[in-house]
């Protein structure tokens, strides 16, 4: 078997979206699974839309997810350069060879003339180009040139049906009448995507083209161009094509670049970790097994085969992404999770960078099994870095838990905690259990509900006794005494 060579070739426009990165992942996983090579090049021939900011964002997205490449931008390789904007001389040379060989011809017809010819022949005027210019006489060409017309350049499409075995979809066929001669270069001689993309694939010896389903209708054109490139000695072989399924959003609509869920960086900023994102992206059209949704990158590489990719559209499910991410958060080693959480909290929240390391390690351990995304840690931990006088109660939680009956456990809890000399979790737990559970006979939910509101402001927090240890004895007692003063809690009008 020929060594596998796949490519990822995005245009540097906008921010990286889920569909784009899923395509990169499947190419990368296939290269790594087969021991092949991934070529990363940039299609930056649209000066009006391309940007260096977008280019940097694409690089950032791949590096964040841990996807590397064997040759391409930022790395180099035997087929440099890897940006299309730097390969224009190459395209012009290939275009000239195609013209000289008669594979490509000048077409002078305007869109209006094509429509008029269709109407005159009783055909649908919107059928598209009618191949009229393919065999113009020298006199006709001279007449058009005399008018000052500048031709576009079209590839001669063989009059045949187009069939191929798609790596994802199996046997695919397009009838010949659906494939008119198509433009490969503008009237100013500038080659189009329809030419430069296959030329790059040919020169870089790409063996497998894995790309989005939206490009499926253009495959006959690429196959025809490959045949022409082989005839002039530019291409050695035609690659195998595999068309990856659409990623759907809400309802039955394709996930749009404008959808917030489409933005990879939105997910990163919300606290999705790379392992969770990679796992979920892989599930958008592929699965490890019917009963295993959670897997790591090594399992993905060991098992990924493009032949197992489904042809049906994949649906993006935010809740499933977060559930998978939660599993990967729990799989992290505690020290690793602590470091990642600290970096995230420092960058994305108001959590102070100078919070004591030993306390943060405990806090991280308390929330690792309680969050789905890193951003949820802020709501659970912000009480630790809020000044006592600035703590605000969640009104709904306070109204439910700070009734007249809460005064007794608050009094008993405060008295018990004041007597604790060594402020540790076991001592705090023992003192409160004796005072509230044993002596007062309260159930834990009743006994500790008011205390939890008192120290955190919320009905849901990390474990109570550990939270009190982190908060410290002084702040714990100050907050509980303020809570007692505000019990029963009355919502301000």
Curated annotation (Swiss-Prot):
Cellular component GO terms held in the UniProt record: cytosol
Record motif 'KMSKS' region, residues: 254-258
Motif annotated as 'HIGH' region, chain positions: 10-20
Top-tier EC class: ligase
Organism superkingdom: Bacteria
Keyword Nucleotide-binding: yes
One of the protein's GO biological processes: glutamyl-tRNA aminoacylation
Catalysis performed (reactions): tRNA(Glu) + L-glutamate + ATP = L-glutamyl-tRNA(Glu) + AMP + diphosphate
Binding site for ATP: 257
Any one GO molecular-function label of the UniProt entry: zinc ion binding
Keyword presence, Cytoplasm: yes
InterPro entries, A to Z: aa-tRNA-synth_I_cd-bd, aa-tRNA-synth_I_codon-bd_sub2, aa_tRNA-synth_I_cd-bd_sf, Glu-tRNA-ligase_bac/mito, Glu-tRNA-synth_I_codon-bd_sub1, Glu/Gln-tRNA-synth, Glu/Gln-tRNA-synth_Ib_cat-dom, Glu_tRNA_lig_a-bdl
EC id: 6.1.1.17
Subcellular location: Cytoplasm
Keyword terms, alphabetized: Aminoacyl-tRNA synthetase, ATP-binding, Cytoplasm, Ligase, Nucleotide-binding, Protein biosynthesis
UniProt record similarity statement: Belongs to the class-I aminoacyl-tRNA synthetase family. Glutamate--tRNA ligase type 1 subfamily.
Summary of the function given for this chain in its UniProt record: Catalyzes the attachment of glutamate to tRNA(Glu) in a two-step reaction: glutamate is first activated by ATP to form Glu-AMP and then transferred to the acceptor end of tRNA(Glu).
Subunit structure: Monomer.
Protein name in the entry: Glutamate--tRNA ligase
Organism whose genome encodes this protein: Corynebacterium glutamicum (strain ATCC 13032 / DSM 20300 / JCM 1318 / BCRC 11384 / CCUG 27702 / LMG 3730 / NBRC 12168 / NCIMB 10025 / NRRL B-2784 / 534)
UniProt lineage: Bacteria, Bacillati, Actinomycetota, Actinomycetes, Mycobacteriales
